[in-house]
Amino acid sequence: AIVSLVKSDQICIGYHANNSTEQVDTIMEKNVTVTHAQDILEKTHNGKLCDLDGVKPLILRDCSVAGWLLGNPMCDEFINVPEWSYIVEKASPANDLCYPGDFNDYEELKHLLSGINHFDKIHIIPKSSWSNHEASSWVSSACPYQGKSSFFRNVVWLIKKNSSYPTIKRSYDNTNQEDLLVLWGIHHPNDAAEQTRFYQNPTTYIGVGTSTLNQRLVPKIATTSKVDGQSGRMEFFWTILKPNDAINFESNGNFIAPEYAYKIVKKGDSAIMKSELEYGNCNTKCQTPMGAINSSMPFHNIHPLTIGECPKYVKSNRLVLATGLRNSPQRERRRKKRGLFGAIAGFIEGGWQGMVDGWYGYHHSNEQGSGYAADKESTQKAIDGVTNKVNSIIDKMNTQFEAVGREFNNLERRIENLNKKMEDGFLDVWTYNAELLVLMENERTLDFHDSNVKNLYDKVRLQLRDNAKELGNGCFEFYHKCDNECMESVRNGTYDYPQYSEEARLKREEISGVKLESIGTYQILSIYSTVASSLALAIMVAGLSLWMCSNGSLQCRIC
C-alpha cells in the first residue's frame, strides 16, 4: 500500500519570551531568567542635602547645636533662623562651646529638638536690667569675634560691680501660649583667688526653680588644664518652661544668666542628622546623611539613618521581584525541527518571542497559514494579579519610617552599646524578612504563571477531546480540517465538538487502518525472510558436505 503523509492542522499553547536577561532568586532556585522583573531595592542617592517636602533644613555648617543655641559669636548667621525640616550638624563642628565646659543633658536636648521645627528667639531678661552687676564688658579670649574677645550672645556672664555682688533674685513668667526653652549656666573658677576676683563672695550658689524643677548649684573650684587659654570651666543647663509657669533665679555669684529664650512655635517630625554634605538646592521626601533618596521602592541600602517618608533600610545588595514569566526562548533550530510550540508547565519547551501582545497564547498552523494570538483574558488577569501583589508589597513597606541617630553621654556607653546591638538585630531581622519575602513571592509568581499556562492547555484539551491528538509538547494535532474560523473558536472557547466529531472519527479510523495494513505487511515480509534464510543455509551446508566427501576430507557411508 502507498501512504501519502499530509501535515495535519495544529494548535499549540505557549507563553511569551523576550531578550531579557533579568534574573531573580526563588526559594528553590537562584538566578532564574525572567521576562520581566522589578527592582525593589533603592541603591542610589544624589549626594546632597535637600529640602524635605519643600522645607529647608537648618544646616549648622561649622557650628554645633550648643554653639547655635548659646550664641557662639562664630555662629551669628544662626541668630534668627526660619522654620526647618531637619537639622544638620557635622561630626566634629569647630564652633561648639567656645568657653571650655559642658552642656548638661545635651543629648536629651538634642532628642527634644527632633520634635521641633521652629523657634522664635525672645528677650526674657535684658542685659541692661543688671544694674548692680557687671553685665556688658565681661568677655573671654576663648570666644573671639573679628579678632577681639567676645562671649555667647544669648546668655550674660555676671561679674561683681564696685567690689560687690549683691544676691540676685529674678523671675520670668511665661505668658506665651507656647513652651519656652530657657538656658543658663555656672562658672567654675580655677582657684579661690579667681573666685573672689570675679564674684567677691568666696562661697556662692545658684538656685533655679519652676513648678517641675528645683535645682541648687555650687561652683567647683579646682585647678584644671588650660583649654583655649582658660583654666576655668562653664557648665550650662536648660529646661522647658510651660505656659503660665515661672522660672525663678537666685544667686550670689558665678551665675551665667539667660538673656534670650526660645519659644517653641512649631512641633513636628524633625531630626539632627550628622553629615558633612552641602546644601544642594533640591527637594526630596527622604533624606539620609549620604544624600537624598527619591524613590518609590520599599527598601534601600544607602544608610540606616533617615528622615522623611523613606523606604526601609536593609543590608541586602539585591532585591528583585519577578513580575513576568521564566524566560527561555526557543532556539531557532528546534523551531525548524519540531515546529512552533512552548509553555512552562513541564511539557512545553520554550517561549515564543514572536508573541508580543500577551503573556500566554496560541500558535496555529493550517492550510491558510500560521500565526500567533495572545490570550488577552488570561494575560490581563495575570497582569492585574501580579501588579496588585507588587503594589501591595510596596504600599505595606513604603510608609514613613524615620531612623534617626541617638546620642549618649560618656556615662551611658553601656546603654549606647546595647542600643547599637538592638538596632543591628532589628536590621538583621528586617533584612532577613525582606529577602525571604522576595524569595517566596518570586516562587509564587512563577508558579502562578505555570498554573495559568496549564489552565489554558486544559481549556483547549477539554474542548477538543478526541477530535485532536495531544503531541506531548503543548500542541494538539487535529483529526479534522481546522480553518482560521475553527482556530478562533478554540481560542475563544466556542469550539463546536459535534460539528467536527464525524470527520475526526473517520480520520482516526483511516490512521488506524493504515497502521494495521502496515503491521500485516511487515509480518508477511518477516516470515518470507525467515524461510528464505533457512533454505539458503541448508543448501550451503549440503554443498559443503559433498565437497568434503569428494576430496576425502569426509567419509560418507550409506547404510
From Swiss-Prot:
Matches recorded under SUPFAM superfamilies? Influenza hemagglutinin (stalk), Viral protein domain
**Where does it live in the cell?**
Virion membrane; Host apical cell membrane
* Lipid bilayer topology: Single-pass type I membrane protein
Q: Which Gene3D superfamilies match?
A: 3.90.20.10, 3.90.209.20
Q: Name a biological process GO annotation.
A: fusion of virus membrane with host endosome membrane
The record's annotation in HAMAP family points to: INFV_HEMA
Q: List the disulfide bonds.
A: C12-C475, C50-C282, C63-C75, C98-C143, C286-C310, C482-C486
Cellular component aspect of the GO annotation: host cell plasma membrane; membrane; viral envelope; virion membrane
Function, please? Binds to sialic acid-containing receptors on the cell surface, bringing about the attachment of the virus particle to the cell. This attachment induces virion internalization either through clathrin-dependent endocytosis or through clathrin- and caveolin-independent pathway. Plays a major role in the determination of host range restriction and virulence. Class I viral fusion protein. Responsible for penetration of the virus into the cell cytoplasm by mediating the fusion of the membrane of the endocytosed virus particle with the endosomal membrane.
**Chain's gene name:** HA
Q: Name one Pfam family in it.
A: Hemagglutinin
Instruction: Write down what this protein is called.
Output: Hemagglutinin
Protein family per UniProt: Belongs to the influenza viruses hemagglutinin family.
Site annotation (Cleavage) points to: R338, G339
Which Gene Ontology molecular function entries are recorded, alphabetically?
host cell surface receptor binding
**PTMs per UniProt:** Palmitoylated.
